[in-house]
Every structure is written in structure tokens, then in C-alpha cells.
Amino acid sequence: MNTNKALFLDRDGIINIDKGYVSQKEDFEFQKGIFELLKHAKSLGYKLLLITNQSGINRGYYTLKDFEQLTQYLQESLFKELGFNLDGIYFCRHAPEENCACRKPKPSLILQAAKEHQICLEQSFMIGDKESDMLAGLNAKVKNNLLLIQNPLKTPHSWIQCKDFKEMIDLIK
């Protein structure tokens, strides 16, 4: 039975500032407000699951080992700052033209994470900064989809647009 709730989190643009194909810890900078968001969600019992497209691997911009080392740095930094880690890391290494089954906006990474962590999608949130993040959430049937964006988009979709993490914290109960 799926009884856990989760925050499905994009990495670049949500966890860290998106500087384009971030692969080294020297280039990794946490987003302002992300620690507060993660702490709030964790205190309410949410699992924290990273869902990220990392096409830089297959494009040859960086290696799988680079990604794994940066992910280890991310986890160690979170533990040092907050006393906990992300509960799961799910990534797609493919470029869009490879037409794989795992790249957002396809839902398979979210569905895999939900299955492995017994997540109730009705009680969960997808948090991202791009349309592909929101569409992945919608395609996976995640009930709540929060888009971090400074300039609101006109969209027929049911996601909620937030200008900062404070707005998101107020929505996550």
C-alpha cells in the first residue's frame, strides 16, 4: 500500500543554481531557500526524491563518475547543513534526441521512485523550474505540481506557479 508522501525535486534550478551542465562541486551552489523547503517537508514526513535529467553525461560534457561524485557532495552537504539526505536519486543520462523512456517530461523516473518508496502520488508534490518538470509530474499523476518561476506563464495546465521557496513552503502541508 502506498502510504508515504514525497517531494519529487528537480536538481538544476531547484536544489542548485542552474549554471548549465553543472558537474563539479566548485560550480555547485545551493539555491537560496532550498534548505528551508527541505527542512519543512522533512518535518512533515515527506520523502525527498531527486528527479533529474542529466544529458551532459551522454553528450560527453561530463562522465557518470563526475555525476556520482557531485551527487555524493550534494548528499554530504545536505547532511552537514540539515542532518539528513535526499531519500532517493533518480536520473536520466540521455539527450532528448535519444528518445528514451526515462527523460522528463516522461513520467517513468517519478513512477519508479514512487514504486520503490511506496509513495501516494495524490499526497505528493513535483517541484521544478521547467515545463518538462511540470509535465513529468502531470504525466505521473502527481496531484500537486509547483513551478518556480519569476515571470508567470500562461498555461492551460493545473500547476501552481511560485516566485520563491517561501510560497512553496506555505503550500506544502
From Swiss-Prot:
Q: EC number(s) in its UniProt entry?
A: 3.1.3.82
Catalyzed chemical reaction(s): D-glycero-beta-D-manno-heptose 1,7-bisphosphate + H2O = D-glycero-beta-D-manno-heptose 1-phosphate + phosphate
| GO cellular component entries | cytoplasm
Q: In which pathway does it act?
A: Nucleotide-sugar biosynthesis; ADP-L-glycero-beta-D-manno-heptose biosynthesis; ADP-L-glycero-beta-D-manno-heptose from D-glycero-beta-D-manno-heptose 7-phosphate: step 2/4; Bacterial outer membrane biogenesis; LPS core biosynthesis
**What residues does Zn(2+) bind to?**
92, 94, 100, 102
Enzyme kind, highest EC tier: hydrolase
Instruction: Report the SUPFAM superfamilies cross-referenced here.
Output: HAD-like
InterPro entries in UniProt: HAD-like_sf (IPR036412), HAD-SF_hydro_IIIA (IPR006549), HAD_2 (IPR041492), HAD_sf (IPR023214), Heptose_bisP_phosphatase (IPR004446), Histidinol-phos (IPR006543)
- Single GO term (MF): D-glycero-beta-D-manno-heptose 1,7-bisphosphate 7-phosphatase activity
Question: Which Gene3D superfamilies does the annotation name?
Answer: HAD superfamily/HAD-like
List the residues marked with site Contributes to substrate recognition. Answer: 103
Write the record's keywords in alphabetical order, separated by commas: Carbohydrate metabolism, Cytoplasm, Hydrolase, Lipopolysaccharide biosynthesis, Magnesium, Metal-binding, Zinc
Q: Which biological processes are named by the entry's GO terms? A: ADP-L-glycero-beta-D-manno-heptose biosynthetic process; lipopolysaccharide core region biosynthetic process
Q: Subunit arrangement?
A: Monomer.
NCBIfam families for the chain: GmhB_yaeD, HAD-SF-IIIA, Histidinol-ppas
Report the sequence similarity comment from the record. Answer: Belongs to the GmhB family.
Protein name in the entry: D-glycero-beta-D-manno-heptose-1,7-bisphosphate 7-phosphatase
Species annotation: Helicobacter pylori (strain ATCC 700392 / 26695) (Campylobacter pylori)
